[in-house]
């Protein structure tokens, strides 16, 4: 099991476009470096290596002036090159929790991610699970729900390489910062680390490199 560390993007809409763009550049560069070094396309490949970026608004590129060119999956595609096919399956507001206020499992992006049958899946979910509607009520379901997401990806491609991410920081500007979100996010980070071990997937860090930002 590997424990690589890569950089991250921010989810706080209060950030300037320049800062968001800079963070997403870091996000793409570090992630592409990691993937490129440790999972290269072989000469026997029948086609490009399929990379699914699964997540929430951070993956989707919400708040960017031009998400079609600035969202981190786009930057990742640029850095990895033609031997890879990177697709953005981010859904703004999505929760990992199946009983959260906007479950990723119920979104069209989830269905499309499975139909894509990725060779590599990068999952960054958990930020929206800190919502008071979610974590206080369903926190015991977070780890089982994460396992279910991993299992469904493995069902469509048993050889899929899965990387799950510690979540990006939540800034003091966020209206929920003082409502328990800070403590809940720490609990979610710990849960994600447990999932990485129990599901035998790789853990990457989208938090520490941007804290404090």
Label the predicted regions.
Residues 1-54, 58-68, 74-83, 114-117, ...:
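N-terminal secretory targeting modules
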Residues 124, 165-166:
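Alpha/beta-hydrolase-fold catalytic nucleophile elbow
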Residues 88-90, 166, 205-208:
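Residue-level recognition of beta-strand->loop/alpha-helix junctions
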Residues 170-207:
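Substrate-gating cap/lid alpha-helix
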Residues 47-52, 58-147:
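Conserved SGNH/GDSL esterase-like catalytic core that processes O-acyl groups on lipids
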Residues 76, 106-118, 192-213:
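N-terminal hydrophobic signal/anchor transmembrane helix of membrane proteins
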Residues 157-161:
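A short helix->loop->beta-strand "cap" motif at the edges of active sites that frequently abuts
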């Amino acid at each position: 099991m590997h424990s690589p560390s890569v950089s991250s993007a921010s989810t706080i809409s209060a950030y300037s476009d320049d800062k968001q763009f800079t963070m997403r550049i870091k996000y793409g560069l570090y992630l592409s470096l990691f993937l490129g070094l440790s999972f290269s396309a072989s000469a026997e490949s029948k086609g490009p290596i399929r990379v699914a970026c699964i997540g929430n608004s951070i993956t989707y590129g919400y708040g960017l002036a031009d998400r079609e060119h600035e969202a981190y999956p786009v930057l990742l595609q640029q850095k990895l090159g033609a031997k890879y096919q990177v697709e953005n399956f981010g859904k703004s507001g999505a929760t990992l929790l199946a009983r959260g206020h906007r479950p990723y499992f119920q979104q069209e992006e989830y269905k499309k991610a499975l139909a894509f049958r990725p060779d590599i899946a990068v999952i960054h979910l958990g930020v929206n699970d800190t919502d008071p509607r979610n974590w206080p009520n369903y926190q015991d379901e977070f780890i089982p729900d994460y396992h279910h997401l991993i299992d469904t990806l493995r069902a469509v491609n048993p050889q899929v390489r899965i990387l799950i991410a510690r979540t990006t920081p939540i800034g003091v500007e966020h209206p929920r910062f003082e409502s328990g979100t800070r403590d809940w996010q720490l609990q979610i980070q710990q849960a994600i680390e447990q999932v990485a071990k129990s599901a035998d997937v790789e853990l990457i860090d989208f938090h520490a490199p941007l804290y404090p930002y």
